[in-house]
Amino acid sequence: MEGKEEDVRLGANKFSERQPIGTAAQSDKGYKEPPPAPLFEPGELTSWSFYRAGIAEFMATFLFLYITILTVMGVVKSNSKCSTVGIQGIAWAFGGMIFALVYCTAGISGGHINPAVTFGLFLARKLSLTRALFYMVMQCLGAICGAGVVKGYQKGLYESNGGGANVVAPGYTKGDGLGAEIVGTFILVYTVFSATDAKRNARDSHVPILAPLPIGFAVFLVHLATIPITGTGINPARSLGAAIIYNKKHAWDDHWIFWVGPFIGAALAAIYHQIVIRAIPFKSRP
């Protein structure tokens, strides 16, 4: 037992087979922050992995919109709450799809599936501006296509039931909607930072495998809280795809909220995690 305790205390770098589950493979003292991503990285444009990651973001956002908008349509068209999955079912559809899609794409693109997540990670210098812009474009295109497929074979149902577009609900002000989007996106992006934290991943080897679970659960909980207010955006691509395909005036009246709110929330989450939680600007540099 004394030998094992000594191995763990030293980081167990040389005795990985004796390391208890969940203990550090690398001590905090020996941990080094990964270098920030360059602002511009033109070399990415000649790499197949760059385009493969963009395609993964497109497909993930396409599938996300397809499943979630179908779920929303099924709930909205029902005359009885007892005959449908209700708000809880919608929240599970959004959270469950994020869980599945992050798990599928994390090793290829990072599993963003959301321009707000991409924006937050860019502010934290986790990826280059080149990649961030490419991801956002592919996410928006995927969302448009996903909503378009739903409308393509259920046009009447789609147009008569709001098309899954995000709007501020009657009884709430634009400020209420903006606040809900800021806080909801903050929760999501803060969870993403925590679940993918490089230092935590180095310390606990099981953390990267579990990362999709808290991210999906955060999406689920935010939807439970804010569906009655805005229909829950917290994802500008999701809001844009539904608005473009539905394309009715009221879908555009409050659309700015679903870009400004998530981007503010993502920026606040990035600042909070990097400066307050990780204190990266205050760490001494050699």
Curated annotation (Swiss-Prot):
<dbReference type="GO" id="GO:1902074">
    <property type="term" value="P:response to salt"/>
</dbReference>
<feature type="transmembrane region" description="Helical; Name=6">
    <location>
        <begin position="257"/>
        <end position="277"/>
    </location>
</feature>
<feature type="short sequence motif" description="NPA 1">
    <location>
        <begin position="114"/>
        <end position="116"/>
    </location>
</feature>
<comment type="similarity">
    <text>Belongs to the MIP/aquaporin (TC 1.A.8) family. PIP (TC 1.A.8.11) subfamily.</text>
</comment>
<feature type="topological domain" description="Cytoplasmic">
    <location>
        <begin position="196"/>
        <end position="208"/>
    </location>
</feature>
<dbReference type="GO" id="GO:0009409">
    <property type="term" value="P:response to cold"/>
</dbReference>
<keyword id="KW-0938">Abscisic acid signaling pathway</keyword>
<keyword id="KW-0346">Stress response</keyword>
<dbReference type="GO" id="GO:1901002">
    <property type="term" value="P:positive regulation of response to salt stress"/>
</dbReference>
<feature type="topological domain" description="Extracellular">
    <location>
        <begin position="153"/>
        <end position="174"/>
    </location>
</feature>
<feature type="topological domain" description="Extracellular">
    <location>
        <begin position="76"/>
        <end position="88"/>
    </location>
</feature>
<comment type="function">
    <text>Water channel required to facilitate the transport of water across cell membrane; mercury-insensitive. Promotes primary root elongation and root hair formation. Contributes to the tolerance to multiple abiotic stresses including salt (NaCl), cold and water deprivation, by modulating cytosolic K(+)/Na(+) ratio, maintaining osmotic balance, and reducing membrane injury (e.g. oxidative injury). Also regulates the expression of abscisic acid (ABA)-responsive genes during dehydration and salt stresses.</text>
</comment>
<feature type="transmembrane region" description="Helical; Name=1">
    <location>
        <begin position="55"/>
        <end position="75"/>
    </location>
</feature>
<keyword id="KW-0812">Transmembrane</keyword>
<protein>
    <recommendedName>
        <fullName>Aquaporin PIP1-1</fullName>
    </recommendedName>
</protein>
<dbReference type="GO" id="GO:0080022">
    <property type="term" value="P:primary root development"/>
</dbReference>
<keyword id="KW-1003">Cell membrane</keyword>
<dbReference type="GO" id="GO:2000070">
    <property type="term" value="P:regulation of response to water deprivation"/>
</dbReference>
<dbReference type="GO" id="GO:0080147">
    <property type="term" value="P:root hair cell development"/>
</dbReference>
<dbReference type="Pfam" id="PF00230">
    <property type="entry name" value="MIP"/>
</dbReference>
<feature type="short sequence motif" description="NPA 2">
    <location>
        <begin position="235"/>
        <end position="237"/>
    </location>
</feature>
<dbReference type="InterPro" id="IPR000425">
    <property type="entry name" value="MIP"/>
</dbReference>
<dbReference type="GO" id="GO:0009651">
    <property type="term" value="P:response to salt stress"/>
</dbReference>
<feature type="transmembrane region" description="Helical; Name=3">
    <location>
        <begin position="132"/>
        <end position="152"/>
    </location>
</feature>
<dbReference type="GO" id="GO:0005886">
    <property type="term" value="C:plasma membrane"/>
</dbReference>
<dbReference type="InterPro" id="IPR023271">
    <property type="entry name" value="Aquaporin-like"/>
</dbReference>
<dbReference type="InterPro" id="IPR034294">
    <property type="entry name" value="Aquaporin_transptr"/>
</dbReference>
<feature type="transmembrane region" description="Helical; Name=5">
    <location>
        <begin position="209"/>
        <end position="229"/>
    </location>
</feature>
<dbReference type="GO" id="GO:0006970">
    <property type="term" value="P:response to osmotic stress"/>
</dbReference>
<feature type="region of interest" description="Disordered">
    <location>
        <begin position="1"/>
        <end position="34"/>
    </location>
</feature>
<dbReference type="GO" id="GO:0015267">
    <property type="term" value="F:channel activity"/>
</dbReference>
<dbReference type="GO" id="GO:0009738">
    <property type="term" value="P:abscisic acid-activated signaling pathway"/>
</dbReference>
<feature type="topological domain" description="Cytoplasmic">
    <location>
        <begin position="1"/>
        <end position="54"/>
    </location>
</feature>
<feature type="transmembrane region" description="Helical; Name=2">
    <location>
        <begin position="89"/>
        <end position="109"/>
    </location>
</feature>
<feature type="topological domain" description="Cytoplasmic">
    <location>
        <begin position="278"/>
        <end position="286"/>
    </location>
</feature>
<dbReference type="InterPro" id="IPR022357">
    <property type="entry name" value="MIP_CS"/>
</dbReference>
<keyword id="KW-1133">Transmembrane helix</keyword>
<keyword id="KW-0813">Transport</keyword>
<dbReference type="GO" id="GO:0009414">
    <property type="term" value="P:response to water deprivation"/>
</dbReference>
<feature type="topological domain" description="Cytoplasmic">
    <location>
        <begin position="110"/>
        <end position="131"/>
    </location>
</feature>
<feature type="topological domain" description="Extracellular">
    <location>
        <begin position="230"/>
        <end position="256"/>
    </location>
</feature>
<feature type="transmembrane region" description="Helical; Name=4">
    <location>
        <begin position="175"/>
        <end position="195"/>
    </location>
</feature>
